[in-house]
Amino acid sequence: MARIAGVNIPTNKRIVIALTYIYGIGLSLANRICEGCNIDHNVRVVNLSDDEIIRIRNFIRENYIVEGDLRKEVSMNIKFLTDIGCYRGLRHRRGLPVRGQRTHTNAKTRKGRSKLPVAAKKK
């Protein structure tokens, strides 16, 4: 198994799909990485040489923020919003939708399950 950015990527998949297993790399970014490293998009990870894997690893390290660093940056951004007390930070703190979605009937996932008492069965 090839290890890129601290993630074991699957060997039987195409390189473009395998790169999407890394947090912060989607399909379009994976295509851009392959173009930047001069690697065919359809080649499987098994068929990559060690030199090509090292090229991909270095390209990602130099040009993109992925995995732990990206998670840390996102959490720091959310913490900043909550610290300055803006509306978005307030919504994050309360666990409600941040981007203006309605909450009267929807947003069950974000709000969580309600703690309603369940009626006992009649005997």
From Swiss-Prot:
Residues 97-123 are annotated as: Disordered. It comes from the Bacteria. GO terms for molecular function: rRNA binding; structural constituent of ribosome; tRNA binding. GO terms for biological process: translation. Keywords: Ribonucleoprotein, Ribosomal protein, RNA-binding, rRNA-binding, tRNA-binding. The keyword tRNA-binding applies. It holds the Pfam family Ribosomal_S13. Belongs to the universal ribosomal protein uS13 family. Part of the 30S ribosomal subunit. Forms a loose heterodimer with protein S19. Forms two bridges to the 50S subunit in the 70S ribosome. Located at the top of the head of the 30S subunit, it contacts several helices of the 16S rRNA. In the 70S ribosome it contacts the 23S rRNA (bridge B1a) and protein L5 of the 50S subunit (bridge B1b), connecting the 2 subunits; these bridges are implicated in subunit movement. Contacts the tRNAs in the A and P-sites. This is Small ribosomal subunit protein uS13.
